[in-house]
Amino acid sequence: MTEKGKHQLDAFIALLESNDREGAVAFALGLLERGDMTIPELYEEILAPSLNRIKVPRETEDELIWREHLQSAIVQAVMGACWPFLLLQRQKYGMPGRNTRVLLVAPEEEYHEIGIRMGMDFFVLLGYQVDYIGCNTPRDTMLNAVKTLKPDLVCISVTNYLNLAQLPAIIAAVKANKPAPRVFIAGSALARTGKNALDFGADGALTSFESIREIREVKQ
């Protein structure tokens, strides 16, 4: 990260620490309006690091977890305010995902939502047809959505590594559909296991905007 980028991150973190929702939104939109950052740069260099810095030891959860939730809500407000810029920037990337449908979902008992929300915006930015279901989705609900919507790609996000145990059965059931969609795993849980997406029966892992850009076999 450049020195300028570090100053921008520190300035945003200060706004989060002071619970300044309006200031955080104005700061982020200012970066986009001036052309200092693109949507992916804002998300990956400012928003994600600002939240990833938060560590809540189990013994202090009752005291600190509300701070994490409050700052997460501010980041979600920033992301919502970025939507007009997201639509404006789509042409820059050539719409490689046009005519390709992606379903984004997190399994049951997975409550972390910001990462998959960022993924949704990245897919939209690349021109995909996006169906975003969100977090804590029961297995049968997910499978019904796949059967009804018939996505070309399914992205399953897992942040809590304990939720990885249910993935092989879910992915196998998703791929039992005909035609079978390609399935990708997103979220930070995978990095903590020493395993890769193939070990869970998935076609790959999505860890960044660039990894989404590298997806091939889109419909033209």
Predicted regions and their residues:
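A general structural motif
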Residues: E108, E113-I114, I133-D140, A165-Q166
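Long amphipathic alpha-helical segments
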Residues: M1-M95
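Glycine-enriched alpha-helix->loop->beta-strand junction motifs that scaffold or abut catalytic
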Residues: Q129, K150-D152, F200-D203
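Cofactor-cradling patches in redox/metallo enzymes
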Residues: V124-L125, T137-G194
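Peripheral docking tails and interdomain loops at the edges
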Residues: A189-Q220
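Short helix-loop-beta junction
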Residues: R117-D131
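Conserved hydrophobic helix-helix packing surfaces used for dimerization/oligomerization
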Residues: T100-V102
